Amino acid sequence: MAGHTVMAVVRDPVKRLLSCYSNRVMHHQELSEQKAGAALQAADLPCDPDLSTFVERLPEYCAAVESIWHHAMPMVEYLGRDPQFYTHLYPIEATATLQAEVERQTGIAAKLKRLQTKGPKIDPGTLSAQEVALLKDFYAEDYTLYGAYC
């Protein structure tokens, strides 16, 4: 990719997971009996889990329901394991900077939108120390490779 600009947006994995729970589980009800009951029953997982249950059994929910995996998978699964591949890595809070860089490089007005914003905002402080530890373990490679950019 020499000579090319390669950009990505990164987000703190715990905050990203909380957003996934808020939007996909609470708002879209993707772990409801109606939408995922059969898959969850087959995996012996409860429908409509509370946050603690979701965190404690995250790998199982990811394996049982594709849309949860899609939104909760570690960043290394789609960004790869070499941050040096990217010429620019932007934390999600810096999308305005990314937008300005895209406009600068292309000469075209760029509009970056956040599309999945529904659901309550969940403060990371609501997680117990044990839940944070579980998530840090699940996302360990993300923190190792991309944590400095979040």
Regions found by a protein language model. Name each.
Residues 110-150:
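Charged phosphate-binding loop/patch that engages nucleotide di/tri-phosphates or the phosphate backbone
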